[in-house]
Amino acid sequence: MTLTARKSVLIVDDSAFIRHALCELFRQEADFEVCGEAENGKEGIDKAQALRPDLIVLDLSMPVMNGFDAARVLKRLMPAVPLILYSAFGEKLAEYQARLIGISEIVSKSEHPSALIHKARGLLYSAAA
């Protein structure tokens, strides 16, 4: 499968190590470009409004504003932009809450990184259809 245009991704995570790893993961893929990074939910919202990404990858547990609160605001401001919650938490309650908010996919940090790319592509293809 190939996409006709590169899709922009915003990475939001308070861990500089995770942000860097995710940026490198997406940059290795020919059909993605990382348009920006943010270290908390509030900064993520600001950058999303300025950069208008095709996809946003959010951590759950962050200072200033967590991933759930940021997702609520982002879904109001940019309802068509898919959100992926990339989190260490795997609880059913967190998954249920994420679905209620409108988070499109949940990927555990314990999963192989290819799962994140696979789900990102799936969301962007379904959004384009």
Regions found by a protein language model. Give the residues of each.
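Conserved phosphotransfer cores of two-component systems
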Residues: 49-51, 73-80, 101
